Every structure is written in structure tokens, then in C-alpha cells.
Amino acid sequence: MRGAGWLVTASALTLAALVHAAHGGEKPPSASSASSASPSSSGVDAISAAGAPPPPALPTHIPVTPPNYEVLDAGSDRPIRVLPAATPGRRVLVYLHGYCGDVNAVGAFVPAAAHEGALIALLGDQPCKDKPGRFKWSTDSHALDQRIQRAIRLVNHTHAWDLDGSDVTLFGYSQGALRAEALVRYYAKRYPRVILGGPPRRLKVEHFKHVQAIAVFGGELEDTSQMIAGAEDLIAAGFRARFFLLPSVDHGDFGGELAGNLALSEILDFLSPPPPVIEPATEPAAPTKVAQ
């Protein structure tokens, strides 16, 4: 597993969120207040229980801390969101959110992403009328490819970085996964590694001809049959591909920060395997004399 310095922070944040959610955001009763309550008969207990409000429902998705994005003005384009790499380098991860999705979902895996490289999150090019501030994606793959390349150039110019626009790890979720599939179909040389989260339809093998590695993932509580079938199609065709199952989560959820970081770390390890071990050179054997 890649560097796990993020593990302590993610664990603490996840535990705090779970405790907070379990108590409905309220402070738990103290031991003194609990012990001071007077005993009552079973009949009174039953009446009190019947009239008491129901316990607060746990959230469907475990809340995550919004990423501490740097937001860059992209001129005529929508502002782009940037997270730096843990260690400066050329690797860049581009995130494409889902249909009218929350770009802050990246908060579920910030440290793991930072160990991969800098992260750039774009917003869809079409506004969602019923969800102000949310966006969806058109089917213009050429325009999206150009937006990604401009965003990388802008980040490089702003920070004097040297992110490689021809070696992008592309991460699309739900509708963003569809757009990622379209991008690698036409511009695979720029996107050699692709992560497809919760793709809503079966992947087409012919769209991945020049991709080096494909990771597909879905939640245990959603229908993953087509995701698994698509990954199996790719494997059968000889691609480096794998399906990852996120336990106990539904569509649109990464399971919180601890689970999200663990999952993305494993996925990125798969996409970028360690270099092969080079065996030390052996001494050449002495030449054999040929009988005269």
C-alpha cells in the first residue's frame, strides 16, 4: 500500500462523524444525569416510550470534510478546484463528478489522492436547473478534453509546477465515468490510467484500446452487475482491469473518509504497479573448448 500517513487523520475524522451522527448531533447524557433519574414501573415506562419521539435517523451517507480546495479563476470557463500533491511531481489526477453531483465528494479521499499527485476537479459544463450550484456534463468530449488541458496549463502557470498533461490519471464518477470513457476512446494517449466509479452502463471494450489500466468500482448496496460485467469484458480482452467493491455503501457514497482513502489507495496501487525487479547480471560462463 502507498504511503499511509493519511490514515490517522482519516480515522479520527471518520470516528468523530460517526459519533456525531449516532447522537443526532446532540451531546450524550452524562453519567450523573443518567443515575439521577428515578426508577418507574413498567407501565409508566411503556407509556413514556410510546410517547417519546423516534430516535434520530442515521445519515444515508457518512459525512466527509469538504476539501480545502484552491479555486482558480479560469476566465471564460468555470473556476477549477485544485489540491496539491503530497510530494511535488508531474503526476496529476483529474476528477469528473456525477450528474448534478457534489464536487466536495473528493473529501472522502484527499490524502490518498495527494499521494498520487496533484488533483484537479472540474465542474460540468451545464447547470442543473433544480439544483443551484450543481452541474452536469454535455456529450462534447473534444471540449472537455480541451478544458482539462487548459486547466493543467493554468495550474502549472499559477504555481510554476510541471504537471504532465499527457500522463493524466482520469477519475470519473457516475455520469463523470461516462465522460471519462468517452475521453479515453478518443484521447487515450493523454489518459493512460482511468478510474470509473459507479458507471451507469456496461463498458464497451473497444473504447479502451490504448488505455494501460482500468479500475472500476461500485457500492455493495447498488446494482453492480453491469459494472462487473464490463470489467470482466475488459479482462477477457486482455486489458489490465479490475472491479473493486466498496462494502456497505450505495451509489454516490464512498463510505466516509477512512473507507474512501483505503479504497482509493488500493485502486491507485493497482493502476500504478511497482516497477519490475531487475535481476542482477550473472557472470558469463567460461567458453567451452571445441575438440579439434
Predicted regions and their residues:
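Alpha/beta-hydrolase fold nucleophile elbow
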Residues: 161-173
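Gly/Ala-rich beta-loop-alpha elbow adjacent to hydrolase catalytic centers
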Residues: 172-176, 180
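A conserved short beta-strand
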Residues: 189-201
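Short beta-strand/loop motif that positions the catalytic acidic residue
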Residues: 214-218
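A domain-start/cap signature at the N-terminus of enzymes
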Residues: 18-92, 117, 232, 279-283, ...
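Serine-hydrolase catalytic machinery in alpha/beta-hydrolase-like enzymes
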Residues: 54-84, 90-163
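C-terminal catalytic histidine-bearing segment of alpha/beta-hydrolase fold enzymes
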Residues: 224-292
